[in-house]
């Protein structure tokens, strides 16, 4: 076949063109993303019961839902959060669970639980599929100098959200910063008592004023008429004249006993954009959608959307991920170009021929571009990890070309013609190429069998790299020999390499031969050195600070203001504004948007901070956070937490402000509160941690109404009536629905806030008894002050408290978790108090447990494949003996660069396994051939093989090293994710380049002698 290809050079060139064109077409179709799509199958269930306390929501709504949902197959984690009037249950499924099938099971479970839920719920629980690991791709702000926030929210919900959701690639559009408009009825309790109106009667009057149902039609022989009544009241003015009752010939209207205003459903919610009030829309993408194209489509639609807005409404883009992604990918492309250029430079310097350098110059782009076609077929995207695979592949795919090219060049230098040299050269190294390719491929194919997050995260990297390597094998066997036969010339005709470089390499070659001969005479000492290197590997790995993923500088910060749970919404607003003004003072900040109250809790606020592009600011995201922390003024009752938003966020169940979270669980709620406070206080004292924030253990003030049930029964008052009156008075109860062609709105009933500033208002609340008489609440009850949780959390079916935390500067996640374990041991936490890591920390812990098994599995897989190829149990051990030196180099380089051992560094270690094995395969394969063909002794064969293979070994190592060097030196956006990979490869190759040139021949000889001894022993026994 090779001979036939050599006689068909045009076919080979057209094959290269076909591969390149196929890849180029696929490249234009690939989606763009910062990281591979890692979908955590997650479903969020929401239920509402306006006015219900958090504890009531947890026991009457969350608990029945959890019992039903917890029985669904494939649920890996279940947590719930209950606050005033709302419950949120988060279900996380196993990574291999089909989300659509899970959604059907969730709907069935909700239907099964409906009979156990309270009857007063305004609607059935709803669910939606979410991907909590995915950051929003875009955010818009709606603001107006004249319109209230509720009207802006209405525009966003009824117009913008609908239109945006129709754009291809848009997943979910979420609104925050206010709520839908509502007619708010704020009742004067004194007027109620004066006119003798009961709250339940008032509620019924309001509900009866807004009927909406079929009213029929009239028919005659020739005509038909629809029967209709005037429409529903729409505004506060329409409700002011509502007749509540007639008394003693007088008409009592709503305006006489209540203030009626055009308001919002939830007055404890607000939003902002920089200095102005605003409603914020955050947009996420659909799984697999091209972020760049989706954002471009949104930007293209914005002029039309702005035209739909009133003239006094501004629609502003405040968050756009595309510039950062463009910059990151641009830096990755530059890094790829530098890597290719450096690799070609290595070939030219060693072979000294422009023609020779041109051959891998063709092979590299053919292999890399053709890989895009494989990426497209697998549904991959252009992202940091897949581009890192291509950057590394630039140094690996050239290895095969170098081996073929160097061997053909060697035969040319011996006097063979180009065609004969090409044929003999490729035949000699054909098996070597297959062994090198399979050895490297099996490393990354092994990762695909690990499952879990590691497999999902590195699937694109692994398959992309394996595809490039396999294509490289085809190109090296089918195309490179043909190009060599046409382009290469004997040394007399070719442009020779610079004489100085030739002389230097000749001296190196001579020195290596002499030193190798001396080392072969001290085999035991070299084997002891190798054993020491193995031990040093284990020590350095155990001591290396370990982390999950490198912290990225995305230019997006998240801030969280945690207020004292006893503070009201109005009290917290100026405190939150202090932090907002602080953020806006920093020159690197471009925009800040956020929400106050709402589902976050009355006293809390979330900030989304957008920094200027990296080219326009001097500080990194971490330095901006350090400045904000250092300059944050003391705010009584307020805490400000900050962290850098990441492209990949592991889902947690508590919505903590820190980067990581610890869940504390118990069935005994008082014990849970006691121990969660002790644990969180202990964590605050750990110097390795910062921003420790406990969620769920704080208490807000409560008025506890103690009802004398016997007295209430004597007075003809039942508990249902009491609960209804209290709900009507204090819970922002939605008592009627207003139907509109565009949306549905509510009428909200409550006591006037002017009368609810003191618990004494309870003495003026009246309840209607069974006989129609009005009975003061104080006639059968007393009240006292107490404490209650502002939010109630469950993890699984247990009450839980979440403690969020971040790491101090220079502290790895492993060190932080070890410090927490030590603190827990000192506290002697009892067995009935359970703890569990969540979010990034949980994923890190799982990956850390899997790492040794993953490394062992890769080594076993390599051993088996090499054993099959070489038909020997010993030669694979020789090849594997090269790995310890690479590991030592990688771990030392990480330590010197002060980089933690993260999953990206682990990926670099796997790459090193494949690269350094190539060196041993080149040497051993040639030595075995010399033993078979020329009958040389093992010592002579390995010495000669090492001398003859020195040039390709050095070339392939330098190609890999220089190909990874741009990863180390890159300073642009996204470099913090690529640098650990580059440092690992460069450090490992620098050490292994030197050591393996000596240890491989020694191990080969030792194992060959062992083989001969065993063979002799068997012969004697036979």
What are the functions of these language-model segments?
Residues 1-341, 382, 456, 638-639, ...:
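Membrane-proximal extracytoplasmic
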Residues 530-631, 635, 657-658, 679, ...:
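Juxtamembrane segments of multi-pass membrane proteins
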Residues 266, 321, 387, 631-1010:
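C-terminal transmembrane helical bundles of large multi-pass transporters
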Residues 3-9, 287-290, 326-383, 445, ...:
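Interfacial segments of transmembrane alpha-helices in multi-pass membrane proteins
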Residues 308, 325-334, 350-352, 380, ...:
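Cytosolic juxtamembrane regions of multi-pass inner-membrane proteins
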Residues 2, 394-408, 430-449, 456-498, ...:
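Transmembrane alpha-helices and their membrane-interface boundaries in multi-pass membrane transporters
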Residues 10, 18-53, 111-121, 376, ...:
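Transmembrane helices with small-residue packing motifs
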Residues 1-31, 429, 497-549, 638, ...:
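Signature of alpha-helical transmembrane segments and their immediate interfacial
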């Amino acid at each position: 076949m090779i001979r036939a290809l050599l006689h068909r050079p045009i076919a080979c060139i057209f094959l290269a063109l076909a591969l390149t064109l196929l890849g180029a077409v696929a490249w234009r179709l690939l989606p763009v993303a910062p990281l591979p799509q890692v979908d955590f199958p997650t479903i969020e269930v929401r239920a509402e019961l306006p006015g219900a306390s958090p504890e009531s929501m947890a026991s009457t709504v969350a608990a029945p839902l959890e019992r039903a949902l917890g029985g669904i197959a494939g649920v890996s984690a279940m947590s719930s959060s209950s606050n005033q009037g709302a419950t949120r249950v988060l279900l996380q499924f196993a990574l291999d669970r089909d989300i659509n099938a899970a959604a059907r099971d969730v709907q069935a479970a909700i239907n099964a639980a409906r009979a156990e839920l309270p009857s007063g719920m305004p609607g059935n629980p709803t669910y939606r599929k979410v991907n909590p690991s995915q950051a929003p791709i875009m955010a818009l702000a709606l603001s107006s100098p004249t319109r209230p926030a509720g009207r802006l929210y209405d525009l966003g919900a009824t117009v913008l959200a609908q239109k945006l959701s129709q754009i291809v690639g848009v997943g979910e559009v979420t609104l925050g910063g206010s709520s839908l408009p509502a007619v708010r009825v704020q009742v004067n309790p004194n007027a109620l008592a004066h006119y003798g109106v009961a709250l339940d009667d008032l509620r019924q009057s309001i509900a009866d004023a807004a009927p909406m149902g079929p009213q029929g039609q009239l028919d005659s022989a020739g005509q038909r008429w629809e029967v209709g009544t005037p429409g529903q009241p729409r505004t506060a003015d329409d409700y002011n004249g509502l007749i509540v009752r007639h008394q003693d010939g007088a008409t009592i209207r709503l305006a006489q006993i209540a203030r009626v205003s055009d308001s919002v459903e939830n007055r404890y919610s607000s939003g902002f954009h920089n200095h102005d009030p605003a409603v914020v829309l955050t947009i996420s993408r659909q799984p697999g959608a091209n972020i760049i194209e989706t954002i471009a489509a949104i930007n293209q639609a914005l002029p039309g959307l702005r035209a739909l807005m009133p003239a006094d409404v501004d629609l502003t883009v405040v968050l756009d991920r595309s510039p950062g992604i463009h910059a990151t990918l641009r830096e990755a492309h530059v890094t790829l170009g530098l890597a290719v250029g450096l690799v070609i430079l290595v070939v030219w310097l060693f072979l000294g021929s422009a023609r020779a350098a041109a051959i891998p110059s063709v092979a590299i782009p053919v292999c890399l571009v053709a890989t895009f076609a494989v990426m497209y077929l697998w549904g991959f995207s252009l992202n940091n990890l897949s581009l890192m695979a291509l950057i590394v592949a630039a140094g690996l795919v050239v290895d095969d070309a170098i081996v073929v090219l160097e061997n053909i060049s060697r035969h040319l230098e011996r006097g063979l013609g180009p065609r004969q040299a090409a044929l003999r050269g490729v035949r000699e190294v054909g098996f070597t190429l297959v062994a090198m390719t399979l050895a490297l491929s099996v490393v990354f194919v092994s990762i695909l069998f690990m499952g879990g997050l590691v497999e999902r995260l590195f699937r694109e990297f692994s398959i992309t790299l394996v595809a490039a390597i396999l294509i490289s094998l085809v190109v090296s066997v089918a195309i490179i020999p043909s190009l060599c036969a046409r382009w290469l010339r004997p040394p007399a005709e070719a442009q020779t390499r610079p004489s100085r470089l030739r002389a230097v390499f000749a001296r190196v070659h001579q020195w290596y031969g002499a030193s190798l001969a001396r080392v072969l005479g001290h085999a035991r000492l070299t084997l002891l050195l190798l054993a020491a290197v193995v031990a040093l590997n284990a020590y350095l790995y155990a001591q290396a600070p370990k982390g999950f993923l490198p912290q990225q500088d995305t230019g997006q910060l998240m801030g969280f203001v945690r207020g004292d749970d006893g503070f009201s919404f109005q009290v917290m607003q100026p405190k939150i504004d202090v932090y907002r003004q602080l953020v806006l003072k920093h020159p690197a900040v471009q925009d800040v948007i956020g929400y106050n109250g709402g589902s976050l809790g009355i006293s809390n606020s979330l900030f989304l901070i957008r920094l200027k592009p990296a080219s326009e600011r001097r500080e990194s995201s971490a330095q901006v956070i350090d400045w904000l922390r250092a300059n944050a003024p003391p705010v009584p009752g307020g805490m400000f937490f900050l962290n850098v938003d990441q492209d990949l966020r592991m889902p947690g169940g508590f919505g903590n402000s820190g980067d990581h979270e610890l869940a504390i669980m118990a069935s005994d709620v008082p014990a849970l509160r006691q121990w969660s406070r002790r644990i969180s206080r202990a964590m605050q004292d750990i110097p390795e941690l910062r921003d420790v924030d406990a969620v769920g253990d704080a208490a807000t003030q409560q008025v506890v109404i103690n009802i004398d049930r016997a007295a209430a029964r004597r007075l003809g008052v039942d508990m249902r009536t009491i609960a209804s009156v209290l709900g009507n008075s204090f819970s922002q109860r939605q008592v009627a629905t207003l139907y509109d062609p565009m949306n549905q709105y509510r009428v909200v009933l409550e006591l006037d806030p002017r009368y609810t500033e003191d618990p004494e208002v309870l003495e003026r609340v009246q309840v209607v008894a069974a006989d129609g008489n009005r009975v003061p609440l104080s006639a059968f009850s007393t009240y006292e002050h107490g404490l209650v949780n502002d939010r109630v959390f469950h993890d699984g079916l247990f009450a839980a408290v979440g403690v969020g935390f971040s790491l101090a500067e220079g502290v790895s996640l492993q060190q932080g978790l070890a410090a927490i374990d030590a603190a827990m041991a000192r506290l002697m936490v009892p067995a009935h108090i359970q703890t569990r890591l969540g979010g990034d920390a949980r994923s890190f812990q799982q990956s850390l447990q899997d790492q040794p098994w993953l490394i062992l599995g890769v080594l076993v897989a390599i051993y088996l494949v090499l054993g099959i190829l070489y038909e020997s149990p010993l030669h694979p051990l020789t090849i594997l003996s090269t790995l310890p030196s690479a590991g030592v180099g990688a771990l030392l380089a990480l330590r010197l660069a002060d980089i933690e051992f993260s999953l990206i560094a682990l990926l670099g270690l796997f790459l090193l396994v494949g690269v350094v094995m190539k060196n041993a395969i080149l040497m051993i394969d040639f030595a075995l051939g010399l033993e078979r063909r020329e009958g040389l002794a093992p010592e002579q064969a390995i010495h000669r093989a090492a001398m003859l293979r020195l040039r390709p070994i050095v070339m392939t190592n330098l190609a890999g090293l220089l190909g990874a060097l741009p990863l180390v030196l890159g300073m642009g956006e996204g470099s913090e994710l690529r640098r650990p990979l580059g440092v690992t490869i460069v450090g490992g190759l620098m050490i292994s380049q030197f050591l393996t040139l000596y240890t491989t021949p020694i191990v080969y000889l030792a194992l060959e002698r062992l083989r001969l001894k065993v063979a002799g022993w068997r012969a004697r026994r036979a």
